């Protein structure tokens, strides 16, 4: 990103394929700032960007400064495929779990699941490298493209898909990421950004040729086979924030993050 680009023209994104349907082919008037999920909230608050898909848990921590943009998010309705607890033993037997330094929501979600099961293993924050994590701990939490790849490489070490576990317990979708803006960021610019991103999402949903192009690009950038990327977008992750997703988000913010009060939206549809 060049120094001359105003922050009002910058959109943050996670460097994972889970939001490629939103960002692939996005109008070039927007400058894109890629960063790990746990960094995006800081970029947003420091006015490095206009909006970004921040971790849901970070919205709970900064809801006094931020409002949410409607319709878009990073959502699962069962298996998410890319937020995975690995280990050589079941979760009930894990004495310690390594947590990735690049995540916020998945750590809150795992803590909530452990509490729900009456478990209290030691947790250690580490860089997101599965081999190193499992050398140090019984369990390892991984997110994003690394998790997708590791599931294929080490299938016998998969102990839990956290999206599936949330939905099994609550009956609601799990919202891992949500687009937010600062309360004082220009509303019209945020509307324009949301509209452009939503247009890309709709193209992905409705245009088979475009969908295949996005899948091919995501496969090439991540090294994940096209068939697996297609399955991921078909059955696991999606970018639509509907009322069921909002219900799940509200429950996560309240139950797992302890956020008081209601979600504040930048505008209502």
Where are the predicted features?
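Short catalytic helix/loop segments, enriched in acidic residues and glycine
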Residues: 30-40
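Bilobed "Venus flytrap"/periplasmic-binding protein-like clamshell domains
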Residues: 1-26, 80-138, 143-145, 247-250
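Pocket-lining segment of extracytoplasmic ligand-binding domains
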Residues: 125-215
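Hydrophobic/proline-rich hinge and linker segments of small-molecule sensing/allosteric domains
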Residues: 68-91, 168-185
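Beta->alpha turn/N-cap motifs
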Residues: 15-18, 36-38, 48-65, 70-72, ...
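Secondary-structure end/capping motifs
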Residues: 186-255
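Conserved C-terminal helix/tail region of periplasmic/extracytoplasmic solute-binding proteins
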Residues: 259-269
């Amino acid at each position: 990103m060049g120094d001359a680009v105003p922050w009002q023209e910058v959109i943050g994104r996670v460097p994972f394929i889970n939001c490629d349907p939103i960002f692939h082919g996005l109008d070039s008037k927007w400058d894109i700032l890629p960063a790990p999920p746990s960094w995006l909230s800081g970029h947003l608050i420091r006015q490095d960007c206009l909006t970004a898909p921040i971790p849901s848990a970070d919205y709970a921590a900064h809801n006094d400064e931020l409002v949410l943009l409607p319709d878009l998010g990073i959502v699962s309705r069962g298996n998410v495929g890319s937020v995975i607890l690995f280990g050589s033993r079941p979760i009930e037997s894990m004495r310690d779990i390594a947590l990735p330094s690049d995540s916020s929501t998945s750590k809150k979600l795992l803590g909530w699941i452990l509490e729900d099961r009456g478990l209290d293993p030691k947790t250690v924050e580490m860089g997101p490298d599965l081999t190193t994590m499992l050398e140090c701990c019984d369990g390892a939490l991984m997110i994003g493209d690394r998790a997708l790849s590791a599931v294929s490489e080490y299938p016998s070490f998969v102990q839990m898909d956290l999206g599936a576990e949330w939905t099994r317990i609550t009956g609601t979708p799990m919202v891992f990421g949500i687009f937010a803006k600062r309360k004082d960021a220009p509303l019209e610019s945020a509307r324009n950004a949301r509209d452009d991103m939503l247009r890309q999402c709709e193209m992905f949903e409705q245009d088979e040729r475009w969908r295949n192009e996005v899948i091919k690009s995501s496969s090439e950038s991540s090294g994940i086979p096209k068939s697996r990327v297609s399955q991921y977008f078909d059955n696991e992750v999606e970018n639509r924030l509907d009322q069921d997703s909002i219900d799940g988000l509200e429950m996560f913010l309240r139950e797992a993050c302890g956020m008081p009060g209601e979600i504040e939206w930048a505008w209502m549809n």
